[in-house]
C-alpha cells in the first residue's frame, strides 16, 4: 500500500488518542525490540516498525549480503517479496529511480502483517514456530548525504520533520499503538544523528503526535562509543518530551 505526499487530507479516518506517549531508546535491533514488546503481554497490540529504505531497489543490497537495517529486516521476515508488489514497484521504487536528487520524498510503503520467522543475528536462524510474530512495516527513505547535497542544516531538519510526520500519519491511519523507530538515515546515508534525533523529538512534542501512540521505541544498536547513534539519541530523547 503506497502513500503519496499529496493525499494527507484523506488521513485520520480512525486514528486513536492516548493521554500520554512513552518514548524509550533501547540498545537493540528493530525486530528484537518489537518481539520483546509483543511478548510482554501485548500480543493484541498493533505494532509497526520503520524500514530505513533504499528508495531505488527493494531490499537494498540484501541479495549481495549487505548488513544494513533494511537488509536485516528482509533476511528475517517475508518483507522482501512484499516490496515487489506492483504498487510499490511503480509508485515508490521506479518513481525514485526517475528522480535525480538524493533527498528523495515523503512517500511511504505500508506493509501490514509481515511475518518474522528468523532471529536477526548476522546469519539468521529459523525461530521455533511458536515464536514467529507479525508486525506492520513502514518503508521510507531518509535523505542520502553520501553524495554532494546543497541543503542547510535548518532545511535538512525541516525535511526530516516533514518525513517523520508522514511516517506517523500512516501509522496512525492503521491504528498502530506502538511504533519502533531508530537512527533513521544515520548510518550509510550519513545524516547527522543529533539533528535527526531533535527532528524526531520536536515532531513527537507536537500536539497531534504526542497523543498518537501509547509507546514509541527507538531501537539502535550500540557500538560502545560515547558518540555513537545510541548515545546521541538517548541524550536527546531520553528526557521527558514535555
Language-model features and meaning:
Residues 1-179, 183-242:
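Macrodomain-like recognition of ADP-ribose-binding/processing modules
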Amino acid at each position: 500500500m503506497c502513500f503519496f505526499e499529496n493525499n494527507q487530507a484523506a488521513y485520520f479516518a480512525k486514528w486513536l488518542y492516548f493521554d500520554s506517549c512513552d518514548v524509550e531508546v533501547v540498545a537493540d535491533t528493530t525486530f528484537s525490540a518489537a518481539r520483546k514488546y509483543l511478548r510482554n503481554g501485548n500480543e493484541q497490540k498493533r505494532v509497526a516498525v520503520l524500514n530505513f529504505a533504499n528508495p531505488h531497489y527493494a531490499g537494498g543490497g540484501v541479495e549481495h549480503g549487505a548488513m544494513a537495517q533494511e537488509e536485516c529486516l528482509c533476511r528475517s521476515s517475508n518483507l522482501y517479496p512484499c516490496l515487489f508488489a506492483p504498487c510499490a514497484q511503480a509508485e515508490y521504487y521506479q518513481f525514485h529511480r526517475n528522480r535525480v536528487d538524493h533527498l528523495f520524498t515523503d512517500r511511504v510503503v505500508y506493509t501490514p502483517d509481515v511475518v518474522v520467522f528468523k532471529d536477526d543475528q548476522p546469519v539468521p536462524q529459523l525461530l521455533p514456530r511458536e515464536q514467529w510474530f507479525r508486525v506492520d512495516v513502514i518503508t521510507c527513505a531518509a535523505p542520502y548525504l553520501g553524495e554532494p547535497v546543497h541543503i542547510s542544516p535548518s532545511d535538512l531538519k525541516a525535511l526530516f520533520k516533514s518525513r517523520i510526520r508522514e511516517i506517523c500519519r500512516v501509522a496512525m491511519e492503521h491504528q498502530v499503538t506502538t511504533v519502533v523507530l531508530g537512527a533513521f538515515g544515520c548510518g550509510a546515508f550519513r545524516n547527522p544523528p543529533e539533528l535527526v534525533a531533535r527532528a524526531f523529538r520536536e515532531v513527537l512534542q507536537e500536539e497531534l503526535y504526542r497523543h498518537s501512540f501509547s509507546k514509541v521505541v527507538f531501537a539502535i544498536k550500540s557500538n560502545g562509543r560515547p558518540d555513537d547513534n545510541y548515545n546521541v539519541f538517548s541524550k536527546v530523547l531520553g528526557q521527558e518530551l514535555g
